[in-house]
């Protein structure tokens, strides 16, 4: 199963890394994309991880970079796209690319957002993921979503919280089961 992580990059082993951030190398300085990859790999060690770096070391990105990463997926045999990031504005171009990906059977899983709803989770043909606590109650910070799962994970004695973690869990589960 080929999973593309659109994020701040992925440190460590990937099938391919594509960098859409000008004047930066492929390193994940924020370690956010690396966290997402580690969560997915914990659920499915056999997954093929591809990385599209669209977030710079300052933590920002724009719709154009997201569109470029989605176009990469459209032409490169990607099965599932994980987008654990959010942008505030709608783009017709991105919705068009998402529709084309959906027609090809590519699943797009996106974080619903922490404290506010964000794109790409708000686009059509995207599975938005929210966060719950250990008892299955929706976390107060979680934006409304299509599906919910745990929003807290612990890796190497460090605890991480947010809809980004929830999104990686759903991506990991989907990557284990295949899809058609």
Regions found by a protein language model. Give the residues of each.
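Extracytoplasmic/secreted envelope proteins and their assembly/folding machinery
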Residues: 33, 37, 67-70, 95-98, ...
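Subtilisin-like peptidase catalytic core
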Residues: 22-89
């Amino acid at each position: 199963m080929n999973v593309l992580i659109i994020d701040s990059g992925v440190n460590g082993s990937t099938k391919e890394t594509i960098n859409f951030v000008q004047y930066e190398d492929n390193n994940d300085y924020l370690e956010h994309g690396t966290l997402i990859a580690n969560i997915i790999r914990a659920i499915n060690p056999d997954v093929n991880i591809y990385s599209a770096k669209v977030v710079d070391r300052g933590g920002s990105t724009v719709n154009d970079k997201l569109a470029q990463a989605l176009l990469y997926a459209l032409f490169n045999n990607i099965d599932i796209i994980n987008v654990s990031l959010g942008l505030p504005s709608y783009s017709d171009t991105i919705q068009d690319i998402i529709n084309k990906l959906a027609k090809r059977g590519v699943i797009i899983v996106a974080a619903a957002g922490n404290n506010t709803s964000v794109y790409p989770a708000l686009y059509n043909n995207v599975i938005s993921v929210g966060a719950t606590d250990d008892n299955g109650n929706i976390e107060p910070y979680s934006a409304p979503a299509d599906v919910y799962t745990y929003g807290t994970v612990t890796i190497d004695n460090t605890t991480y919280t947010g809809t980004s973690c929830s999104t990686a869990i759903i991506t990991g589960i989907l990557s284990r089961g295949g899809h058609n």
